[in-house]
Each structure stands twice: as C-alpha cells, then as structure tokens.
Amino acid sequence: MSGGACIAVRSLSRSWTDNAIRLIEADARRSADTHLLRYPLPAAWCTDVDVELYLKDETTHITGSLKHRLARSLFLYALCNGWINENTTVVEASSGSTAVSEAYFAALLGLPFIAVMPAATSASKIALIESQGGRCHFVQNSSQVYAEAERVAKETGGHYLDQFTNAERATDWRGNNNIAESIYVQMREEKHPTPEWIVVGAGTGGTSATIGRYIRYRRHATRLCVVDPENSAFFPAYSEGRYDIVMPTSSRIEGIGRPRVEPSFLPGVVDRMVAVPDAASIAAARHVSAVLGRRVGPSTGTNLWGAFGLLAEMVKQGRSGSVVTLLADSGDRYADTYFSDEWVSAQGLDPAGPAAALVEFERSCRWT
C-alpha cells in the first residue's frame, strides 16, 4: 500500500513471451514473400480487350498453404494478449490446413498442440497434422468441434485459438505485409496494377475481411468477390441478408464453406458472391492443374471458376483490366480425393459438364 492506495500486481516475467515472438518473427524473416503468378490466358479472344489473371501462390509457405498466414497471426495475437505462456496447451477446431500450420508454430515454440476434428477426417490430413507435431482429438459430428475445443482447452488449462472468431481481428488489415498489401505491391509494375476484382473463398472469413478492409482503407477501386461451395451458409446468408442460417451438412470443398456463418465473415466488405457447384470446383482444379503442370487444391478450383466468370464478363463488356485470385494450397494433398475419379464418383459428382465448359471458355471466352 502506498499513500492509502491499494495495489494489485499480476506482472510476470515476459522473457519467454519475448523469445516466442522473436522466434515467430525470425521465422517470417527467413521466408520470402509468396509469388504472384501470371496465368496464361488465350490471346485469341482478347483482340479488343486486354485482360490479365494472376494467382497469388500461397503453396510456397513452409506449411504449404494460405493458412500459414492465419496461424502466424493467431499465435502472435494470443501471445500479445497474454493468453499463451510456456506451459500452455494450444487447441484449435480444425481438420485442415489451419491445424497443419498451427501445429508448426506450436512446435516452433515448444508447446503441445491439439486439433479437434470430426472422426471422418481423412488419414492423409491427420498424418500431415501429426507430422508437424500436433495431436488429433476426434468428435463424431462436425458441429461438435467448437464446444469440444473449448472443453479440451479448459480441461488442459490451455488456450483455444478459435480461428473462426479471431481470424478477422488477429491480422493487421491496414498493412504490415498482409496478403492484401502484398498483392498490391507485387502488382505495381503490371499493365493493370489495380485489379478490377480480387476473388477469394471463405472458410473463417478472415481473408476476405482483411482484403476487403484493405481495399477500402487504401481507397482502391478494386471490388471483392467471394466464391462459396455447396452446403455453405455464407452465400445464402449474404444473398438473403440473414446470418442465422445453419446448413444440415458440411462443405465438401476442403478449406472453404461453413455450415454456419462464422463471426469473422464480414459481408459489408464483399461486393459480390458466387455460388460454385462442387463439380465445377473439382473440374476447375483439374483444369488449372493441367495448365500449370502441377496440382492445385479444390478451393483454388472454386476461386478460378469465379475468376473465369469475371474475366468473361469483362471481355463481354469490353472492359480491360486484371483479376487476382489465390492458389490456396497444393493438390498433392488431395490425390486420394478430388483427383481420384472413384472418390469423386462416390460423392455423386460429375465434373464432365463443367470441364467441357472450361474448354469452351478457353476457346471462345464464352461463359455459361
């Protein structure tokens, strides 16, 4: 007590936290920015209109996907909020690329990591998470992952990262080399440096929130298009203006689409949404893989289906410009699923029609 005032002190040594942040920052400095690839569009149908398509290649992150950025931001957010210390078990609700990337950062800091996921998660994805040092905890239904992740974190005295709530707030959307700033810096010397459109999918909603906010903050004329797969609540919520929608089943396109509208999804920064059939996402992923000479993941197929439609619209309207989308992860992770004819058929999907539409698009720039 001093001068009659009561004092309460909770301050602890920050040496471990300081070092943890240093390790994450050092890891980032050792990594180059991801490439911005120019997609080879046919010149034949662009005689009067000059359009260009770019892919931001997020597969070159050390953990192989766009989710590396999110995982890094979530860890820094939790560390700077005092939620993680040297004795914390880190928990997440994820069966996908987010869990792979978060397991990497947990291992970097010497912390245990538990990913809560549906029991139906593929063996290959479980193996990827475990290869980064993570442990998988299973629930029967995908709707149970949120509550179970909270329970596991409480039981272990750990911290639930909660990507679905914190994705939009953990990333500095004003800049600091976020994905939006990186795109615009890399586009500076291109013929059409300010994209007409940026196309992304929505899983947590964090990427679309970051890009949409940045566009407005920097006063760019770019518009943001969000593509959404079947069985996702985002598109019907956006089109109907209702955010209490819950879907009875989960998205079949890995990494995007959710059965509920996640807290990080900000519809107010989205200019357009496109509902993409799952068969079209698969057909586009296979088509683009053949063009690039390497496999891309299914959500990249969803992105490209949306981007191709916008390019066709621009050509039809006689409007020159550029479109940018994301190459979210590698298709090598999906050899037994989206690139397996047997698996696709077992899902009741037939990509033949969309595949033919893509061939016609490249021939004539007509879009159906």
UniProtKB/Swiss-Prot annotation:
Top-level taxon in the UniProt lineage: Bacteria
Annotated GO CC locations: cytoplasm; cytosol; plasma membrane
The keyword Coiled coil is annotated on this UniProt entry: no
Cofactors: pyridoxal 5'-phosphate
Record's note on what induces expression: Probably part of the Rv3682-Rv3683-cds1 operon.
The protein's role, per its UniProt record: A cysteine desulfhydrase that generates hydrogen sulfide, H(2)S. The H(2)S produced by this enzyme stimulates respiration in M.tuberculosis, mediated primarily via cytochrome bd with a lesser contribution from cytochrome bc1/aa3. H(2)S modulates the balance between respiration and glycolysis, and also contributes to redox homeostasis. Probably eliminates toxic levels of Cys (which can induce oxidative stress).
Catalytic activity line of the entry: L-cysteine + H2O = hydrogen sulfide + pyruvate + NH4(+) + H(+)
EC number: 4.4.1.1
Extra remark: There is a large variation in the ability of different strains to produce H(2)S; H37Rv, CDC 1551 and 2 clinical strains were the highest producers of H(2)S.
UniProt keywords, alphabetically: Cytoplasm, Lyase, Pyridoxal phosphate
Protein name: L-cysteine desulfhydrase Cds1
Modified residues (N6-(pyridoxal phosphate)lysine): 67
UniProt source species: Mycobacterium tuberculosis (strain ATCC 25618 / H37Rv)
Similarity comment text for this entry: Belongs to the cysteine synthase/cystathionine beta-synthase family. Cds1 subfamily.
Free-text activity regulation comment from the record: Probably inhibited by aminooxyacetic acid (AOAA) but not by DL-propargylglycine (PAG); the former inhibits pyridoxal 5'-phosphate-dependent enzymes, the latter only inhibits cystathionine gamma-lyase.
